[in-house]
Amino acid sequence: MIAETIEVLPIAEVSPLLAAGGTGPFSDAELAYARDKSDPERRLAARLAAKRAAVHLLGPGVTEADIEVTRVPGRAPGLRLSARAQAALEKAGAGAALVSLTHGREHAAAAVLLVRAPA
């Protein structure tokens, strides 16, 4: 492992993004996934926490919009990186970014780990 961080944020932080009708830093796929659930704010808050954690690890020049949290049924969530974010990952000497998400009633959190590329 190269680096790790955890981001925690209030779920209420996401509500204004949904009310305004904007997409914020979320991809169409992230919005569609969340809106298909009974608790879209919680789902999006966990994704926003993951994006912020990844940006923190990948450094300047990478934005929340450069990170997409992916979800395949039956598998752990993943991160899809833009070309800019992928370049930052490689510059850090990492081969992958791993993510874990959680949410409760009031807060959501994500842990992101940068792991070395296989030798």
Where are these regions (language model features)?
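Core catalytic alpha/beta fold that binds nucleotide/phospho-ligands
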Residues: 1-119
